[in-house]
Swiss-Prot record:
Matching InterPro entries: AceK_kinase, AceK_regulatory, Isocitrate_DH_AceK
Annotated family: Belongs to the AceK family.
Protein name: Isocitrate dehydrogenase kinase/phosphatase
This protein's GO CC annotations: cytoplasm
Superkingdom field: Bacteria
Pfam families from the UniProt entry: AceK_kinase, AceK_regulatory
EC number: 2.7.11.5, 3.1.3.-
Gene: aceK
Residues at which ATP binds: 318-324, 339
Species: Pseudomonas aeruginosa (strain LESB58)
Length: 577
């Protein structure tokens, strides 16, 4: 039954939906410890996907409840929403997750109104939190002061973070971690009487790993500190290594990784702590890395509009080979690409618009194993015409007129994805040294193998569809043909029936829609013969259908790959054993 409601009551209903979302988010997150202790790896993957989908499900549920309980004349009167927003601000002022509550309000507003109603008066285009936030710190870290006795501090850490599953070999791990810290850090650090170790109280869980995250610091310097932990089934918990290199820690929090499960009483405080460890990371990426991807989206959007307002940067087409399905543009001074679906695809492409959207959602929900770039989806972006180079705007209007629309002096982009900008692998190799070429091609092969072991087949594996990150990692970013590895039928090319068969431009054998012939990869993937020969030496087993069939068999048996976001010696083949 619809009824009349004051603004404060509507605000309370919106906040009640947020509380429901946060409670279920915490419930899923809190289960990560038990899943790690019980080695429930497939359940961990399901929980990750469930938590990603939870936000949109709860937004839809809240919007439906508002529509059912309130008259349209009250709910859909946009003139009332500045009053509702003010009432909402008063209700979230004392919360410890208030910035997330603002983003939730925005999501509800966008679920009720078209995007042309968006303004800072009706929703939180700009946050109100920094000037209002109470500065009481939550006790979310533990501090250890070795006083020259690092071993004793490590023993205390092992005790404080113990699990219900015993350590595999506590003494061995203590000795190894102690030795690694002494070798990784300058000689004087471990002896410094003022050295302190500060660790976040909550454990970070992701896939088959757990991580203790913090820092080592003296009065003058600091180093990030990460202890990766593994559960070796049948043996126990193992401190796998210790990481103090900022670049390596940055990779652990990379945009190519799945989101961490970590208890976060005060999100802004945790993100601020991580930002001190990783100053090169944007707030958007840090919020996203701990599961608050919608907050990451808000922070990204605010950074984007600030960049456009404070620079002369203009959108240009992204460098690289033009895509057959997507058109990609970028801002030179903003480390992001914007991807839109073309109205018409190249005839060789069998996908449609709906399929492309499904592929991007698959990537969002799946374990990205450090080899798939995360994306954010946006609707109804509006930019001034003056922010586009004429050639860029003309191309976008030509290839995607249903998505890119002129509205006077404003360009409306109805739908797009944003993604971290990388150097296309084919362009990277054009200027690479011999050593860089070998390293990049080796990582390209590892990327394909790690994706395959995680049940992902890229489909179109051309070099142009992979990018190189600032840390030199090779990442796949073209998703229109991506699929589960177990959906593919890997075959050997049949022997020719007659000598003439080999000379024919058409195959002498039938080819199904999911058939893939790995023997054809060398010719399709590499025009450069030197690169082709080098890749065959590095990863020649990718050309053998039996290799792929073996991976499929192990995936169907329920094996979950170990892919470590830090340096290890194992190959992808060994990790499945």
């Amino acid at each position: 039954m619809v009824q009349s409601a004051p603004a404060s009551e509507i605000a309370a209903l919106i906040l009640r939906g947020f509380d429901d979302y946060r409670e279920q988010f915490r419930e899923i997150t809190d289960g990560a410890r038990a899943r790690f202790e019980q080695a429930q790896w497939q359940e961990a993957q399901r929980a990750s996907a469930q938590r990603i989908n939870l936000y949109e499900e709860k937004v839809a549920e809240t919007v439906a409840g508002l529509r059912a309980g309130l008259a349209d004349s009250e709910l859909l009167d946009v003139e009332r929403w500045p009053i509702i927003k003010s009432a909402y601000i008063a209700q979230i002022d004392l919360r410890l997750d208030d910035e997330l509550a603002e983003t939730w309000f925005n999501s509800i507003f966008c679920g009720l109104f078209s995007h042309d109603n968006i303004s800072d008066g009706t929703m939180f285009v700009h946050t109100t939190r920094p000037s209002l936030r109470a500065h009481a710190r939550a006790p979310y870290t533990r501090t250890y002061r070795p006083g020259g006795d690092l071993r004793q501090a490590l023993e205390k850490i092992f005790d404080d973070y113990r699990f219900d599953v015993p350590y595999d070999d506590r003494e061995r791990d203590l000795e190894r971690i102690d030795a690694l810290l002494h070798s990784n850090l300058p000689d004087w650090v471990c002896k410094d009487p003022d050295l302190a170790i500060e660790l976040i109280g909550s454990v970070f869980y992701r896939n088959k790993g757990a991580y203790l995250v913090g820092r080592l610091f003296t009065p003058d310097e600091q180093w990030p500190l990460v202890f990766p932990l593994l559960h070796r089934e049948g043996h126990g918990i193992q401190f796998d290594t210790v990481i103090t290199d900022e670049a390596e820690v940055s990779i652990i929090f990379s945009f190519t990784r799945s989101y961490f499960m970590v208890d976060v009483p005060v999100p802004a405080e945790l993100v601020a702590f991580l930002k001190r460890l990783l100053p090169g990371k944007h707030l958007a990426e840090l919020y996203t890395s701990i599961g608050f991807y919608k907050q990451g989206k808000s922070e990204f959007y605010r950074a984007l509009i600030n960049h456009l307002a404070t620079t002369d940067d203009r959108f240009v087409m992204a460098p690289g080979v033009r895509g057959m399905v997507m058109s990609v543009f970028t801002l030179p001074g903003f480390n992001t690409v914007f991807k839109i679906i073309k109205d018409r695809f190249n005839p060789s492409k069998s996908v449609d618009h709906a399929t492309v959207i499904q592929k991007y959602q698959l990537v969002k929900n799946h374990d990205r194993v450090g080899r798939l770039a995360d994306t954010q989806q946006f609707a109804d972006f509006r930019f001034p015409v003056s922010k586009f180079e004429p050639e860029c705007l003309a191309e976008l209007l030509e290839v995607a007129p249903s998505t890119v629309v002129m509205e006077g002096d404003v360009v409306l982009i109805r739908h797009c994805w944003t993604e971290r900008r990388m150097t296309p692998l084919n362009i990277y190799l054009e200027n690479a040294s011999e050593a860089q070429t070998r390293e990049a091609l080796n990582d390209y092969g590892l990327a394909i193998k790690q994706l395959a072991a995680a049940n992902i087949f890229p489909g179109d594996m051309l070099l142009k569809n992979f990018g190189v990150t600032r840390h030199g990692r090779v990442v796949f970013y073209d998703y229109d043909e991506i699929c589960y590895l177990t959906e593919v039928n890997f075959r050997y090319i049949p022997e020719p029936r007659f000598p003439e068969d080999e000379m024919s431009s058409e195959p002498w054998y039938s080819v199904g829609p999911n058939d893939v012939f790995p023997e054809e990869f060398p010719r399709f993937l590499f025009v450069d013969l030197n690169q082709r020969r080098l890749f065959a030496k590095l990863h020649g087993n990718l050309y053998d259908a039996k290799y792929w069939q073996g991976l499929q068999e192990q995936i169907r048996e329920g094996k979950v790959i170990d892919v470590f976001p830090y340096r290890r010696q194992e190959t992808p083949e060994q990790l499945l054993k």
